[in-house]
Amino acid sequence: PRNHSSAASDVYKRQQVGCVVNCSFCATGKQGFSRNLTLSEIIGQVLIAENSFRSIDNPKEKNITNVVMMGMGEPLLNFDNVVNAMQIMRHHSAYNLSKRKVTLSTSGLIPEINKLSKVTDVSLTISLHAPNDKLRDILVPINKKYPIKDLLKSVKNYVDSFDDKRITTFEYILIDKVNDSLEIANELANLLKNYPCKINLIPFNEFSLSEYSKPSNNRLRAFKEYLVKKGFITTIRSTRGDDIMAACGQLVGEVKDKTKRKERLKRQVKALELNA
């Protein structure tokens, strides 16, 4: 996606074909995992975006100003290629992007987060989506291996390893009547009250085979306003690409039903009985 309101351009890049994390609100995991992208494929996405932007604006300018490792796949599962790509993008002979202009988003792989501070100092975004382990185990299954308490400790260690004052962004997909109540907003505020952070709310983007729904604008605004009153910098991400099923959580080649064959047959039989 591109920010059309200025000359600045944000590039969201994918790092894998498919995804093994399999968050329940994301279409990407439904297609399974194929492979990691190579270093050249990751950098190639930036070059393609740059050429596209040049055709719109000044053809001689490099106007890519922000790169976010937040597309299809979990960046930290393609650790070496992603780190090398970020280093290239920050090099003065390439895009000369500062550490604050390159962001890595992760679902919370603690060992890789712990390694990250030794090789880079880019901005970190955490796909949180729930304030407690019971709910996050459902939404982000990797939480069963890396629970919230341990994840936040790892994030704090990453931030504290640098001298500058920086904040962590926590991404939070809002799903209707799943994680969007004011009670949950209060729980989220209590969880993050000791962390310098920004909370980025993302309305759920619906896709085929999903059992979830997008929250109403009223519930979305109420959730945000509650967090703001609690003192948090809170934003609502503008949905882009949903008209072509390419918004956050919709990136997929073909949504395939990965349900076990036995369960699929049961559903098919039930459907036939209802239609009989």
Question: What is the meaning of each model-derived region?
Answer:
Residues 1-8, 12:
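Single conserved hydrophobic/aromatic residue that forms the stacking wall/gate
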Residues 28-37, 72-74, 100-101:
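Flexible, glycine/proline-enriched loop segments at strand-loop-helix junctions
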Residues 30-66:
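Conserved alpha-helical substructure of the radical SAM core
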Residues 37, 108, 239-243:
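Short beta->alpha linker loops
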Residues 51-57, 63-230:
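Conserved AdoMet/S-adenosylmethionine-binding subsite of the radical SAM
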Residues 201, 236-238:
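A structural preference for short, hydrophobic beta-strand core positions in alpha/beta folds
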Residues 241-276:
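Radical SAM enzyme core and accessory elements
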